[in-house]
Amino acid sequence: MKTANHPDTVLIVDFGSQFTQLIARRIREAGVFSEIVPFQSAEAAFKRINPKAVILSGGPASTSDIGSPRAPQIVFDAGVPVLGICYGQMAMCVQMGGVAESSNHREFGRAFVEIEKDSPLFEGLWATGQRHQVWMSHGDRVIALPPGFQVFGKSESSPFAIFGNVERKMYGIMFHPEVVHTPDGARLLRNFVHNIAGIEGDWTMRAYREHAVEAIRKQVGKGKVICALSGGVDSSVAALLIHEAVGDQLTCILVDHGLMRKDEAAGVVAMFRQHYNLPLILVDASEKFISALEGEVDPEKKRKTIGRLFIEVFEEEAKKLGGADFLAQGTLYPDVIESVSFTGGPSVTIKSHHNVGGLPERMNMQLVEPLRELFKDEVRALGKELGLPESFIGRHPFPGPGLAIRCPGGITREKLEILREADAIYLDEIRKAGLYDAIWQAFAVLLPVQTVGVMGDGRTYEFVCALRAVTSVDGMTADFYHYDMAFLGAAATRIINEVRGINRVVYDVTSKPPGTIEWE
């Protein structure tokens, strides 16, 4: 979605931090639209957007490195408020005439700042003499302030942890206010955009809807669009948004790749045909997908194979429809972040997603991705704005590659059927216990491991099933759900008793990070 017509935009210059998108999230929570751009193209973006304020993100580089990233000088010369975070603080310091250096006393994780002087940045939050918890991740520090700047706070290893120039409305902070581990961080960012930058904060999902519809119409024109519908919240919201924008230029296609949950394809078709009146085609491509995936153990190759086959199927269906110019997907921020830096900046790739990094380089259709700037909870809010029922909006996320990435190792039809049954029982137990809405995402994983068991008087040698459940807000970080042991025992017993091929059940207690929510 372009922001050229939005008068109150915050430009976020991305230096490669994995938390850059969380900055955007916090700014949006404050009711202010934001756009992330890589530092390499920040000058052009600044001229295009004419932002009301600029935030410089953190990043993995050191200002001492030759060729390390810098913000365009226009950011500091234009007279708009600027906030530098972590590496962004270092870049601001050096570019404004101060001095920064690599430090032997690094700060990672929880830290504390001591307030030395009151500042508009933390007005109503922190006062002189107070000590407050923050979250840091840096190896550099400021050793000399730029001319006209003053210190507002210090930390154990940095005498200039918070500095600024009140008259020019420029501030630098060594910590990360965007993460939840800085308790007052979100309010500090609100102070910056509302009080210092003077932005009212009137951006809402209704506003996003209007801008997205306008952007879709501009991109699509009179072209035909096919939408990859999975029945999940993301693709459903994308389909409704695009349908609102271009009407009968849209055709939805549900590809049954043989990797869906139990009875899912039939349920999705019934819901969308009966309740939303969207043109929907069901394609049974299960043989095509499973044959291509059978025996493949590399998770990246699985994802890329699925991405390639999806495009092949969509292009085949487009021909049957007389041609299509665009392929629409429900790609979200976290999908893009884990595949490659959203902005093309220097963030580290974690894994490819089938609808991002798994796409072939050559396609005969252009992509339409109206949700790629939104977090999951924002998509749910947009779905509510579009009229989707709460019961549907609250569904757990389900990945496009489906059960393929919940079946580590080689895939077979037999394994998929075992996993499908175990997953259905697990989710049924969660619903019966009244826990479904308290959990962000829950699913079963069939491990490529067999163990010895005893059932009746006989020896068994069958698969291990891992259960996964996490709590999260936006999918960027997650904690495992703390079940009562009685629940886990009951779910495990039912799975072992009812699913032939499983004789052992384990529970995954890994958070994100260090793990990802999905196993592959």
From Swiss-Prot:
CDD domains: GATase1_GMP_Synthase (cd01742), GMP_synthase_C (cd01997). This is GMP synthase [glutamine-hydrolyzing]. Its EC number is 6.3.5.2. Disulfide bonds: none annotated. One of its GO terms (cellular component) is cytosol. It catalyses: XMP + L-glutamine + ATP + H2O = GMP + L-glutamate + AMP + diphosphate + 2 H(+). Residues 203-395 form the GMPS ATP-PPase domain. Residues 9-202 form the Glutamine amidotransferase type-1 domain. The keyword DNA-binding does not apply. SUPFAM superfamilies: Adenine nucleotide alpha hydrolases-like (SSF52402), Class I glutamine amidotransferase-like (SSF52317), GMP synthetase C-terminal dimerisation domain (SSF54810). Pathway: Purine metabolism; GMP biosynthesis; GMP from XMP (L-Gln route): step 1/1. InterPro entries: Class_I_gatase-like, GATASE, GMP_synth_C, GMP_synth_GATase, GMP_synthase, GMPS_ATP_PPase_dom, Rossmann-like_a/b/a_fold. It comes from the Bacteria. It comes from Mesorhizobium japonicum (strain LMG 29417 / CECT 9101 / MAFF 303099) (Mesorhizobium loti (strain MAFF 303099)). Catalyzes the synthesis of GMP from XMP. Homodimer. One of its GO terms (molecular function) is GMP synthase activity. The active site is at C86 (nucleophile), H176, E178. ATP binds at S230, G231, G232, V233, D234, S235, S236. The gene is guaA. The keyword Nucleotide-binding applies. Keywords: ATP-binding, Glutamine amidotransferase, GMP biosynthesis, Ligase, Nucleotide-binding, Purine biosynthesis. The lineage of its organism: Bacteria, Pseudomonadati, Pseudomonadota, Alphaproteobacteria, Hyphomicrobiales.
